[in-house]
Amino acid sequence: MIIRKAEKKDVKGIISPLIMALDEMKTIFSGCEKEEEIIAKYEEFFLLDEGRYSYKNFYVCEVDEEIAGIIVVYYSDDVEKLDNVMLRELNKNGVIRKEFEKEFYENEYYIDSLAVNSAYQGRGIARKLMEFAEKKGKEQGYEKMSLLVHIDKEKAFSIYKKMGYEEDSKIVLYGETYRHMVKQIK
């Protein structure tokens, strides 16, 4: 098992776990309703050099040369720049949106998405991806990690608590309530 920075060649391997992680948000960020259009839009976003879902913000976990899981992380203070790229792409396709709702606070190294393909679940891959992201965040000088977990996902909430994340607020995002959780990494 290795964890590494994603590359453009990973585009086909990251789509399934990314869409699984985004769940109901997949249509909001893509501006699409049909599954094949959603997949095409996230492939397009992934191949960009900038943007929230650019390959530059992904780490992948490989098992036997297959992508077993992904984590998407970026600095929260960079999100306006990252989102402007995505918003321009959406506007080109007639989806007019000025901004996305805010899902984090200032000065956080934010875990946007985390998912493990079903064939690889139960092997501790999600934990390893999170630990890897925390290490990278610390190396880059960030002091705090953050993530959101849906209010109904008690199992995930419990796992994050065991990893040292603490709920500091609740955020309503597109009509759904999420726990905002943070962990100091300095």
Regions found by a protein language model. Give the residues of each.
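Conserved acyl-donor/pantetheine-binding loop and adjacent beta-alpha core of acyl/acetyltransferases
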Residues: Y75-Y109
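A short, internal acetyl-CoA/4′-phosphopantetheine-binding micro-motif in the GNAT/acyltransferase core
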Residues: E62, E89-L90, G94-I96, L114-Q121, ...
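A short beta-loop-alpha structural element at the N-terminal edge
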Residues: I2-S16, E24-I28
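Conserved GNAT-fold acetyl-CoA-binding loop/helix
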Residues: D23-F46, N57, L90-K92
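C-terminal "cap" of GNAT-fold acetyltransferases
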Residues: N91, N107, Y142-G164, K170-K186
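A short helix-loop-beta-strand connector motif used in the catalytic cores of GNAT acetyltransferases and
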Residues: L47-V60, D77-K81, Y110
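Conserved GNAT acetyl-CoA-binding A-motif
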Residues: N107-Y109, Q121, M130, G137-L148
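Conserved beta-strand in the GNAT
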Residues: V60, E66-Y75, Y110, A115
